[in-house]
């Protein structure tokens, strides 16, 4: 079992097909995760970034298809707000000071799969600044049947009231055949979801995942502590 952390997203690498895997990078930012998937998985990557400034920086390399769209529960348009002094993806906070707004096309994962004729999606990476709840609430069981794994960053560290909703979503995903593996301590900032239809999760896999979780969690805590000490210095 090979678990790797890429930009604080845990991926079960050897559960991904070795031949022509498909990855959806939702909340692609500047494309670092998408580029990793191309280089290390040999994947064809569909990279979606809502912010046009960030979308313009997505790499132009073979097998990487960039799109300036927001991932949402349904197709349409969205008006988003971002802080002028920083670049982030997706669900921009309208209560921030010194902001600017823009309108962007929004797409559902189901319509994207249909448009591109994707029979199977090996990996969906979701990091869309809070919009992941709406997206997962609107995903059908028939869509999930075509997905191998999901690596999701929920944003309950910004809004703790999301946690009951997140727990309910994860229960539904379990009922749809996914093994739910929260990697983060105390929060849902890194959740790996594995579809049992395509990858069995045995007892020793669960032990390996638990070991990885605590090792990674300790490393993250130490890294944040060191960063705070460095800033104070």
Functional labels for PLM-detected ranges:
Residues 1-233:
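Phosphate/nucleotide-binding beta-alpha loop and adjacent structural elements of enzyme active sites
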């Amino acid at each position: 079992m090979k678990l790797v952390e890429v930009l604080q997203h845990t991926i079960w690498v050897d559960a991904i097909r070795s031949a022509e895997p498909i990855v959806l990078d939702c909340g692609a930012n500047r494309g670092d995760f998408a580029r990793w998937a191309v280089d290390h998985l040999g994947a064809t990557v569909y990279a979606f970034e809502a912010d046009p400034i960030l979308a313009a920086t997505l790499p132009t390399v073979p097998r990487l298809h960039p799109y300036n769209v927001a991932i949402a529960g349904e197709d349409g348009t969205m008006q988003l707000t971002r802080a002028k002094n920083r670049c982030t993806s997706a669900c921009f906070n309208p209560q921030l000071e010194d902001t600017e707004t823009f309108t962007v096309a929004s797409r559902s994962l189901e319509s994207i799969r249909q448009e591109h004729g994707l029979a199977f999606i090996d990996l969906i990476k979701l990091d869309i600044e809070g919009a992941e709840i709406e997206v997962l609430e609107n995903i059908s069981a028939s869509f999930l049947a075509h997905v191998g794994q999901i690596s999701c960053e929920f944003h309950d560290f910004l809004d703790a009231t999301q946690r009951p909703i997140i727990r309910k979503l994860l229960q539904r995903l379990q009922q749809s055949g996914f093994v739910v593996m929260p990697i983060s301590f105390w929060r849902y900032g890194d959740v790996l979801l594995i579809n049992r239809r395509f990858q069995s999760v045995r007892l020793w896999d669960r032990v390996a995942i638990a070991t990885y979780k605590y090792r990674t969690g300790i490393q993250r805590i130490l890294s944040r502590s060191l960063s705070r000490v460095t800033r104070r210095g």
